[in-house]
């Protein structure tokens, strides 16, 4: 399939990927030095880039840290991804599925759709053997020549189509097994139920004190779920 991909298909992908980027994505050429925020016309030139805008899921990306990562989707009988960006040295890869309909994740969004997407993400992560600690903020830029990039001639995926390839009913309910968007949903529920009960105790201290305590509760919730540290930005996003 990859050998038959035309230059026009690649150009169409780059145009579509660029259009869906945040206006000012996080990006980097070396994650060891952290990430910076730049206009997307600059960020698209970096090796690593934030692919989903704030509060909107346009693509699902999975981090597979093993030498045969390229074949993980095929071995798991999953649908063809939209792209794969592979490390030329060790074979590790990011596998991306672009969504036909982006999913809003704000408090105004439909919670059942978010939970549906989270279950799909969890099921794919398990099937692919992807890294559970990957938060989904930054990806290997599939438009950058550092990586061995493979663009597949497929249309963006509907959620229902993605769900047809996995059994959502068989997912584990243990929150410690949840990662990515599912972890954010679980953290949100845990923290909001605490907040409903605790807000009265913080009314006299002002917003800043209240906000700091909510973030602290989110950190504690995350540590309880996954047992590892998450980027501070993830706490702020769900809190």
Question: PLM features: what roles do these ranges have?
Answer:
Residues 1-93, 99-115:
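Signature for HUH/AEP ssDNA processing cores
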Residues 8, 35-40, 44-47, 114-192:
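Catalytic "initiation/cleavage/transfer" segments centered on a nucleophilic residue
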Residues 74-78, 120-132, 214, 221-225:
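Hydrophobic, Leu/Ile/Phe/Ala-enriched alpha-helical segments that form helix-helix packing faces
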Residues 83-90, 136-139, 232-235:
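A generic structural motif
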Residues 90-96, 125-130:
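Short C-terminal domain-edge/linker segments immediately following a structured domain
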Residues 100-103, 162-239:
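Modules that initiate DNA replication and primer synthesis
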Residues 110, 114, 118, 208-212:
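Generic detection of long, well-ordered alpha-helical segments
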